[in-house]
C-alpha cells in the first residue's frame, strides 16, 4: 500500500512571489477572483485559475499543469467546452479589469479537487483558493460530502482559502 505524504513543516510552500491556484466555475461570483487577486497582490504572486469540467476526462497530464481531455461519453462529440472556456476567460477578464495581477486560465477535467491539486503541484502554488459551496437546502452530510474546499483540505498539503459567497 502506497503511503501518502502528510502535511509537515518541511512541506510548507513559501508564499512570497509564488502563484495561487484558484478554482472557478461558470457564472461564479466575482468575489472569488477578486479575493484571489487581493492575496496575489499582497504576496507578489500570480494566479492560475482552473475549471475542472466534470463532463470530461483526463487523457494526459502535462508538467505545466495543463491536461489533454476528452468527453466522458466517447461516442458523443462535445465541442461545448471551447465555449465554456471562452466564457470563463471573458468572466475573469471583466472581474479582474484594472487589477495589477498576472493570471492564466487552465481548462481541466474530472474531479475539481484532483484537478486543482495537480495544477497546484505543477505550478508550485503556495495555496489554493475556492468559493464556498452554497447550501441550497441540502442535508449537512451532502453539503460536506461535496465540498471541494473540504476535499482539498483533507487530501493535499497546501493551505486552502475558502471565500464565502453568502452568509
Task: Describe each PLM feature range.
Residues 1-16, 94-128, 167:
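Structural beta-alpha unit
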Residues 11-73, 155:
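Small/aliphatic-rich secondary-structure junction motif
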Residues 37, 90, 150:
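Active-site phosphate/pyrophosphate- and oxyanion-stabilizing loops and adjacent acidic/basic residues
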Residues 48-50, 104-108, 161-163:
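General small-molecule cofactor/ligand-binding pocket signal
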Residues 64-68, 122-124, 147:
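Short, hinge-like loop/turn segments at secondary-structure boundaries
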Residues 69-87, 138:
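A short acidic, glycine-rich active-site loop
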Residues 127-154:
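Glycine-rich, Arg-bearing micro-motifs that act as flexible, cationic patches
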Residues 153-167:
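Short, flexible loop segments at boundaries between secondary-structure elements
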